[in-house]
Amino acid sequence: YFNRKLQTTNVEVCLNTRVDVASLVEGGYDEIILATGIAPRVPAIAGVENAKVLSYLDVILARKPVGKRVAVIGAGGIGFDVSEFLVHEGVATSQDRAAFWKEWGIDTHLEARGGVAGIKAAPHAPAREVFLLQRKTSKVGDGLGKTTGWIHRTGLKNKQVQMLNSVEY
């Protein structure tokens, strides 16, 4: 969707490009968006160099194998996304309508009031036991989006993800 949208709106995307003021001025652009990306931060924890310790890039992009009991360090947006990825095996329910409806208890036969009254959610069992760790004392995921944070927290709770705050490392 986004690639197509960029094409149809004639947005020029330049990846892995060093720029300076002169090159930006010479480019004659109407608008400039600098998206510098992000690199995983490696915490100073004894044992972090162990082969069992993976960055989110190792897990998501390189698809390195992940064990059955996983601690995710950091409960921001990336930590939540990685945790969501880890509890699913194969195709995520967000990519399969019938599985999504079943997981969230949505009545597709239009018999339940509002489509949900009296319908029990039936999430599939998590693929792994996941612990989502946060140093802050606030509620885990408190910094997520106001309109979507609740759904991310609920989805992980439904998969028995243990969300721990006030963690020291």
Protein language model regions, located:
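Rossmann-like dinucleotide/flavin-binding elements
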Residues: 14-28, 36-45, 49, 56-144, ...
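Local beta-strand N-terminus motif with an aromatic residue
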Residues: 6, 29-30
